[in-house]
Amino acid sequence: MIEVVDGQRKLSECKRIVVKIGSSLLTANGQGLDLDAISHWAKQIADLHNAGHEIILVSSGAVAEGMVRMKLASRPTDLPSLQACAAIGQMGLIHTWSSVLENHSIRTAQVLLTHDDLADRRRYLNSCDALQNLIDWRVIPVINENDTVSTDEIRFGDNDTLAAMVAGQVHADLLIILTDQQGMFDSDPRHNPDAKLLSTVRAMDDVLFEMAGGGGVLGRGGMVTKVRAARLAAKSGCPTLIASGESDNVLSRVMAGEMLGTLFTTDKDRMTAHQQWLAAHLQTAGRLVIDDGAVEAIKLKHRSLLPVGVKTVEGHFDRGDVVECVDKQGKRVAVGRVNFSSRSAEIIKGLSSDKVYQVLGEARSLEMIHRDHMAIY
């Protein structure tokens, strides 16, 4: 049985909030955008905005709208067709959000992001600055993945993940993921009528993954992706609330203090800006398999990774590239900027610090990855 945390942070005190709304809550059962539903969401968002909260909206629905405009009976399965649908549907999606929020005298801005935008340090910082300016101007960013130019290998994969990464990027106080499910249950409610809704859990609890199910037809994100997103946000010190968007006035009620959905809390302090950028790397240049001693040194003692703790070097990378560190079971432990190329790392792996100098024949850093350039999972 999963451990449940006592108490819940007063969500009304959260100022900067990333709100992600799934496709099923914005479309008329897949038949294009539901204007009435979106207008209803706009009213709730406007209420929070006018109460002084800073709202960043991550909106799904572009592919579903594109399907209707192109009269497609089913969601495409190949990437080029999905990208084309997203490009067509994005026009209607952003126009609709702009129109309904303008009715509340709120300006919006379209922001399309790719994984490359967040993996490249300069582009990451530029997008941070742009988002901060929009927030300062009291403009609500409407964010979506730039599906048209994303490749299959480097996609976020779902807007839950994108929302979590944006939450870290803007230093959000809270991430709200609205879905067609009530929240996290202690077992699958579709098969167990006695399943109980969990009000508060620790985001980093591995047991959560054992409870998650699959995604729907229109969207890409099931409960598994939402749990993964909550963990990603938690690494940036941001809690996540997963709640049913089918509940009446859910945003207003949650921010008024009503206990709805499941709150995923974080035990970690907020990462530094540099660590948050490192954590944003879903794809890395290579991989270092490390031993149990290195895992303990990194996770429990917050030490740098030394060559002696590296068992295997995978991939081809240069000095300064971002690589991931995994344990012997392949579970990600950390990501960081490596001080050696893959060729040098292969030579010095498993060596004690005093032998590194002898083997390389030059004076340089003794750490494979310094702790200041590492984001721990």
Curated annotation (Swiss-Prot):
UniProt: substrate binding residues: S60, D147, N159
The keyword Nucleotide-binding is assigned to this record: yes
Entry-linked CDD domains: AAK_G5K_ProB, PUA_G5K
Catalyzed reactions: L-glutamate + ATP = L-glutamyl 5-phosphate + ADP
Pathway(s) per entry: Amino-acid biosynthesis; L-proline biosynthesis; L-glutamate 5-semialdehyde from L-glutamate: step 1/2
Molecular function as annotated in GO: ATP binding; glutamate 5-kinase activity; RNA binding
GO biological process, one term: L-proline biosynthetic process
Gene3D superfamilies attached to this UniProt entry: Acetylglutamate kinase-like, PUA domain
One cellular-component annotation, GO: cytosol
Positions of ATP binding: K20, T179, D180
Keyword check for Amino-acid biosynthesis: yes
Domain PUA: 285-363
Compartments, as annotated in UniProt: Cytoplasm
Function: Catalyzes the transfer of a phosphate group to glutamate to form L-glutamate 5-phosphate.
Name used for this protein in its record: Glutamate 5-kinase
